[in-house]
Amino acid sequence: MDKEFLISALKSIENAKRENRDRVANIVYNHKELFNYLVELTFLVDDKISIKAAWILEWMCTHGNLPWILPHLDEFTKNISSLHFDSAIRPCAKICEQIAKVYTSKKENEFQSTLTHEQIDAIVETGFDWLITPQKIAVRAYTMHTLYLFGLQKDWVPPELEHLITTKISKESKGCKARGTHILSLIKKHQKI
């Protein structure tokens, strides 16, 4: 199994239906050597194959295989800011949220000893960029939660996030407003502790 095989499998995905994503994700799951190529293809940002690669990368990271991304954290965090297809940004925003959840977990894990300050900064910086530029609701929702979680350790993040939510996001769709209100309540709750 090589990169060309993975490209062929990705091209065979007709749409984002679960069964299509499951089929290709299972191929990668059963041939872990393809994961390197999956990360690489996710960041071919001018090629639409990156969208399908991002879908599968998200599936892998949200179905118990998040640690597989550990050796690729540099590549992932350095390149997420270059994504420009909406359908590739959303899955990567969700992966960022998953990374933030695991990193800030009370349960000791590999991410806490592997994820660097530079990598966190790259995720945070990209997250703020995603919040100030036009993005889909899901990207905003995942990103607000990611920034809240990393803001538990970076003092400057909560006030910036709070400002963005109150001045911009709260004036957007009902979904953004609801998630923004939830994140604001988490920030306030944490400030009282």
Describe each model-derived feature in a short phrase:
Residues 1-193:
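Alpha-helical scaffold domains
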